UniProtKB/Swiss-Prot annotation:
Job description of the protein: Plays a role in cell adhesion, and in cohesion of the endothelial monolayer at intercellular junctions in vascular tissue. Its expression may allow melanoma cells to interact with cellular elements of the vascular system, thereby enhancing hematogeneous tumor spread. Could be an adhesion molecule active in neural crest cells during embryonic development. Acts as a surface receptor that triggers tyrosine phosphorylation of FYN and PTK2/FAK1, and a transient increase in the intracellular calcium concentration.
InterPro entries per the UniProt record, alphabetical: CD80_C2-set, Ig-like_dom, Ig-like_dom_sf, Ig-like_fold, Ig_sub, Ig_sub2, Ig_V-set, Surface_Rcpt/Adhesion_Mol
Record-linked SMART domains: IG, IGc2
The protein's name: Cell surface glycoprotein MUC18
Keyword annotations: Cell adhesion, Disulfide bond, Glycoprotein, Immunoglobulin domain, Membrane, Phosphoprotein, Repeat, Signal, Transmembrane, Transmembrane helix
Residues bearing attached sugar chains per UniProt: 56, 418, 449, 467, 508, 518, 527, 544
TM segment ranges: 560-583
S-S bridge residues: 48-116, 161-223, 272-320, 365-407, 452-499
One Pfam family hit: V-set
Record's subcellular location: Membrane
Biological processes annotated in GO: anatomical structure morphogenesis; angiogenesis; cell adhesion; glomerular filtration; positive regulation of cell migration; vascular wound healing
Residue intervals of the Ig-like V-type domain: 24-129, 139-242
Domain Ig-like C2-type: 244-330, 335-424, 430-510
């Protein structure tokens, strides 16, 4: 019973297969279509693969095949093409003498099979598969701004990657620190989705979820889009991002800025740090040196204690405390010693030394510091280094030794850490004037501003011999400057002005001569002052007598001097005229050469030369030259030479 059934089944199968084996037309297996690849927006060239004989291409129909449905889109008759109404009506044209159909402005919807069918001499068809591609835009990555706690039980969202307007759908790969991530149960999960835009392009969105640890706080994540174009495979990478990772604090410590040795006056920051994220609430305390208990210091919101300017009192032991507000666990840092280096106030002894001329003086400088000190003594007026060390010895004191001396105490190992102290040395003596005499050029009825300076110890006082508005100003403890405003009158021009400086040891006087400025006044020399005030001479140019007073010369004596000068000039002029007259008459035994030969034996001509020098002053010679018009050579100083001969 079973055998007949088996035979019947075999015969039925043979009958069903016989027609295909016999080669019934239209039922043979079709070859694979030709592949044509283009990018969106470009032109696709669909070349009909039928026989190239004119007969085969003169009568061709083009179809688009979508979901196994053929739609006629183009006809070719006798080499002329005609589009059929529909979506391709405006985008098709013939090329290559009718062998190629051009499709412009390709879209993703054009990805399908196109078929060309020839009718003569017999029916043939050729299939073309059109593939369309579009590169996606640069991937956009967004990190999870809320961060990820390390104690999470499930993978948390790390970042989202979006690739827009690609075709077909690109492939996304996630990377961490340059290494690709793969799906891992309870550790890594990648969730992707795509959206079809109205243009037919795809937008891909991929979400990376992972469980992170503390070491991932600096990890770099990025995504990569892989896609294909007619030219081959390509890829685009996003920027790298770091996701906030939250982990508990395990350690708290202190940092001090600047690093290195600190000194008074610096800006010092004591910063509290922790290895947790987010950081705990910080507080900084300093140990009280008396009670040895920690006392909390005032810090800013970031747990930073600012010492500005730092002082010696800021030295001590500091600690930082961190309180985790989530777990309420408190951690304490290791104590750290802070040393603010200092130099105490400098003390000089004696503080106000007074000495007699010719005596000696020893100045001693003292100071304390947290480091080794170096001392040096400087002259205040010049800055000259007088001594390196705490002791300065001054011997055989002169008046010039009075004034300021500065002691500098410094720490060589810490640049800029130093203190100084100035001491003024007073040398007993009567007043010392800045100048003895001075000429001042003035105009009548003008107000003069005269000045007079004197120094000495005890401090001198200055008085004037004329009425006016006077004021004094201390230049230093032993030097005083007095100024006087006075109206120029004829009486003042006659008497001049005196300023007198006096102290317990004597007095001294400076004289100011007043001269009217007019058309006949000669230009003042370099030692006179044309302004209304006098200048102060340096101590090295002062000429002072300390126990005598110098009075202004009487008007009569000044007139006698002027008359004597005029008489001398007249006598010199007469003498010059007489000499010139005798010279022109030949009465003088000399020529222009200034030499006269005296006869001597030839053997002795070179033995005797008499030099005769003129006893006339240079001024007289100048008068003679001016009257005769005879200009002397620059080297001729009026000397005459006479050769003696037999």
């Amino acid at each position: 019973m079973g055998l007949p059934r088996l035979v019947c089944a075999f015969l039925l199968a043979a009958c069903c297969c016989c027609p295909r084996v016999a080669g019934v037309p239209g039922e043979a297996e079709q070859p694979a279509p030709e592949l044509v690849e283009v990018e969106v927006g470009s032109t696709a060239l669909l070349k009909c693969g039928l026989s190239q004989s004119q007969g085969n291409l003169s009568h061709v129909d083009w179809f688009s095949v979508h979901k196994e449905k053929r739609t006629l889109i183009f006809r070719v008759r006798q080499g002329q093409g005609q589009s059929e109404p529909g979506e391709y009506e405006q985008r098709l044209s013939l090329q290559d003498r009718g062998a190629t159909l051009a499709l412009t402005q390709v879209t993703p919807q054009d990805e399908r099979i196109f078929l060309c069918q020839g009718k003569r001499p017999r029916s043939q068809e050729y299939r073309i598969q059109l593939r369309v591609y579009k590169a996606p835009e640069e991937p956009n990555i967004q990190v999870n701004p809320l961060g990820i706690p390390v104690n999470s039980k499930e993978p948390e969202e790390v970042a989202t990657c979006v690739g827009r307007n690609g075709y077909p759908i690109p492939q996304v790969i996630w990377y961490k620190n340059g290494r690709p991530l793969k799906e891992e149960k309870n550790r890594v999960h990648i969730q992707s989705s795509q959206t079809v835009e109205s243009s037919g392009l795809y937008t891909l969105q991929s979400i990376l979820k992972a469980q992170l640890v503390k070491e991932d706080k600096d990890a770099q994540f990025y995504c990569e889009l892989n896609y294909r174009l007619p030219s081959g495979n390509h890829m685009k990478e996003s920027r790298e991002v770091t996701v906030p990772v939250f982990y508990p604090t395990e350690k708290v410590w202190l940092e001090v800025e600047p690093v290195g040795m600190l000194k008074e006056g610096d800006r010092v920051e004591i910063r509290c740090l922790a290895d947790g994220n987010p950081p705990p609430h910080f507080s900084i305390s300093k140990q009280n040196p008396s009670t040895r208990e920690a006392e909390e210091e005032t810090t800013n919101d970031n747990g930073v204690l600012v010492l500005e300017p730092a002082r010696k009192e800021h030295s001590g032991r500091y600690e930082c405390q961190g309180l985790d507000l989530d777990t309420m666990i408190s951690l304490l840092s290791e104590p750290q010693e802070l040393l603010v280096n200092y130099v105490s106030d400098v003390r000089v002894s004696p503080a106000a030394p007074e000495r007699q001329e010719g005596s000696s003086l020893t100045l001693t400088c003292e100071a304390e510091s947290s480091q080794d000190l170096e001392f040096q003594w400087l002259r205040e007026e010049t800055g000259q280094v007088l001594e390196r060390g705490p002791v300065l010895q001054l011997h055989d004191l002169k008046r010039e030794a009075g004034g300021g001396y500065r002691c500098v105490a410094s720490v060589p190992s810490i640049p800029g850490l130093n203190r100084t102290q100035l001491v003024n040395v007073a040398i007993f003596g009567p007043p010392w004037m800045a100048f003895k005499e001075r000429k001042v050029w003035v105009k009548e009825n003008m107000v003069l501003n005269l000045s007079c300076e004197a120094s000495g110890h005890p401090r001198p006082t200055i008085s004037w011999n004329v009425n006016g508005t006077a004021s004094e100003q201390d230049q230093d403890p032993q030097r005083v400057l007095s100024t006087l405003n006075v109206l120029v009158t004829p009486e003042l021009l006659e008497t001049g002005v005196e300023c007198t400086a006096s102290n317990d040891l004597g007095k001294n006087t400076s004289i100011l001569f007043l001269e009217l400025v007019n058309l006949t006044t000669l230009t003042p020399d370099s030692n006179t002052t044309t302004g209304l005030s006098t200048s102060t001479a340096s101590p090295h140019t002062r000429a002072n007598s300390t126990s005598t007073e110098r009075k202004l010369p009487e008007p009569e004596s000044r007139g006698v001097v002027i008359v004597a000068v005029i008489v001398c000039i007249l006598v010199l002029a007469v003498l010059g005229a007489v000499l010139y007259f005798l010279y022109k008459k030949g009465k003088l035994p000399c020529r222009r050469s200034g030499k006269q030969e005296i006869t001597l034996p030839p053997s002795r001509k070179s033995e005797l030369v008499v030099e005769v020098k003129s006893d006339k002053l240079p001024e007289e010679m100048g008068l003679l030259q001016g009257s005769s018009g005879d200009k002397r050579a620059p080297g001729d100083q009026g000397e005459k030479y006479i050769d003696l001969r037999h």
